[in-house]
Amino acid sequence: MTVQGQKMSFTRSPEFRLLIIACAVFVFMSLLSPDRFLSGQNLTSMAFQFPEFAILALAMTITMMTGGIDLSVVGVANLSAVVAALILTQLAGPEMATGPSLIWLGFAVAAALCIGAAAGLVNGSLVAFFGLPPILATLGSGLVFTGLAIAMTGGSAVMGFPATVAWIGNESLLGVPVPLILFGLLALGLHLLLTKTAFGLRVTMYGANPLAALYAAVNINRVLLKVYVIAGMLASSAGLVIMSRANSAKADYGSSYLLLAVLIAVLGGVNPYGGYGRVIGVVLAVLSMQFLSSGLNMLQVSNFARELIWGVLLIFVMVINSNAIGRGFFARAKPTKSS
């Protein structure tokens, strides 16, 4: 393809439209309140805030690319954070700073990721082997994970972390917020996984046409298991970021992030019927939503009104994608009957 052809292809892509939307929202909010929105404090605050729900959106993205969904991501995030928090408070102690005690921090992170992988394995098994609809399977499992977190903490927050934990969520490395660095690494890793590996091709094939993937000798059950395990580990990573940001862990943190994660994935161009999705689109959608959320916060819009706006926006984006963009974009390929 020529350079001119590549430029034309990009300008017609969903990612280009998202870039325009992100820039438009940024400019609008800047004009609305330039002194507050463009202040260094606000821009830094946004860079610290959005990785929490952005990582959950990555988890939602890979499951939606298979035509499924993972409604348990917030429950997995909180359960993982609670387990890590209990390890840090019961075993490491608040005096941890350097030396051998850092081993407990690594152990807590590893334990949280294992919880996420185990939760993903449960979700993947329910979908792949028991044939449950992903929306129902993960809705039920999410309640179970939240219940486990409540049982482990009695419904109260776990606090008293070592200073290193707060540093991860609230400090910068070479001038870049640590949570933003973590999100960037995870987004890059997921992008490479979906675009540069055979596994990513299988995910796209299965999402576009499960029957064709089966005929192509794709091990569908293995693909689904891996997808939900990856989603679970991404959710655990988000839980660790939330824990370090709040310097505490609780079973009901981030309850508003579920709808936001779904909205970001759909706004980012991920086909909810499966078969298409790009991480760059999700990243641009994250930026758009963060700019909008920050603007609503400056306008002192209540959380309840904000939830209403997210819901209306989700429905609007779905309608636009299914009609204006064309039925073929969001229509799952249907196998034709042989004569």
Q: For each predicted feature, which ranges?
A:
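Membrane-interfacial amphipathic/re-entrant helices at transmembrane-helix boundaries
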Residues: 1-57, 92-107, 335-338
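Cytosolic-side transmembrane-helix boundaries in multi-pass membrane proteins
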Residues: 1-27, 215, 219-222, 292-339
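Single transmembrane alpha-helix segments in multi-pass membrane proteins
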Residues: 26-31, 39-94, 125-132, 266-276, ...
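Inter-helical junctions in multi-pass inner-membrane proteins, predominant
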Residues: 35-45, 92, 150, 156, ...
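Alpha-helical transmembrane segments within multi-pass membrane transporters and channels
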Residues: 92-142, 284-285
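Helix-loop-helix "hairpin" substructures at the membrane interface of multi-pass membrane proteins
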Residues: 104-112, 118-123, 175-249
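Transmembrane helix-bundle core of multi-pass membrane transporters
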Residues: 130, 134-196, 223-226, 245-254, ...
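Transmembrane alpha-helical segments in multi-pass inner-membrane proteins
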Residues: 235, 246-311
